[in-house]
Swiss-Prot record:
Record HAMAP family: PGAM_GpmA
Database matches in PROSITE patterns: PG_MUTASE (PS00175)
Active-site residues, Swiss-Prot/TrEMBL: 9, 109
UniProt organism field: Chlamydia muridarum (strain MoPn / Nigg)
Protein name: 2,3-bisphosphoglycerate-dependent phosphoglycerate mutase
Length: 226
């Protein structure tokens, strides 16, 4: 059995302020830091061979904090794929104590366009709660100058299929720390959800969701905490 662990980053400073964040690179709040550490406690005894995050700092912070108390005692190290010489380790002994971490913008949050930096309640008052709900949760409706969930899936799913899924097929246990909508697009594919079903899919911050890869299919595990 091979595991795929999905984790939406801990609360960010802008989550705390109820602002649309998208691609704006905002760090975790104090609560988000604690959520990441708590998530780490939940998954500390699960095997992890490789980590993937987005290029946004809240995703990276969450992964690193979650791994601080992992039972393997292994240290995540960032692989700079554009400059592999930067992260080459020349000691086999040290390499055995490390877990590779890869970053990709394909896993970034959906880009919220003209909503980024705006207060969610104020936007709802301006455009109506139903319109904002469709922007945030529907599959193909995008906010002004932003991405829909469909647009987000056009980058997350090819990256998963090309870069991550082959590792799972090799028996590697994968930990992905990413964002609400990049993970929603992935879960929609893993669970074969319809466009209607994905409307109600909500992912809380800092709650691990675990899938088992067995018999050539993904099944949500009882180990999930979301």
């Amino acid at each position: 059995m091979t595991l795929l662990i999905l984790l939406r980053h801990g609360q960010s400073v802008w989550n705390q302020k109820n602002l649309f964040t998208g691609w704006v690179d905002i760090p975790l709040s104090q609560q988000g830091i604690q959520e990441a550490l708590t998530a780490g406690e939940a998954i500390k005894n699960l095997p992890i061979d490789c980590i993937f995050t987005s290029t946004l700092v809240r995703s990276l912070m969450t992964a690193l904090l979650a791994m601080t108390n992992h039972s393997s005692k292994k240290i995540p190290y960032i692989i700079h794929e554009e400059r592999p010489d930067m992260s080459r380790i020349h000691s086999e002994k040290e390499l055995e104590q490390m877990i590779p971490l890869f970053q990709s913008s394909a896993l970034n949050e959906r880009m919220y366009g003209e909503l980024q930096g705006k207060n969610k309640q104020e936007v709802a008052e301006q455009f109506g709660e139903e319109q904002v709900r469709l922007w945030r949760r529907s599959y193909k409706i995008a906010p002004p100058q932003g991405e829909s969930l469909f647009d987000t899936a056009q980058r997350t799913l090819p990256y998963f299929q090309k870069r991550i899924f082959p590792l799972i097929q090799q028996g590697k246990n994968i930990f992905i720390s990413a964002h609400g909508n990049s993970l929603r697009s992935l879960i929609m594919d893993l669970e074969k959800l319809t466009e209607e079903e994905v409307l109600s899919l909500e992912l809380p911050t800092g709650k691990p969701i675990v899938y088992e890869w067995t018999e050539q299919k993904f099944t949500k595990s009882a180990l999930s905490f979301g």
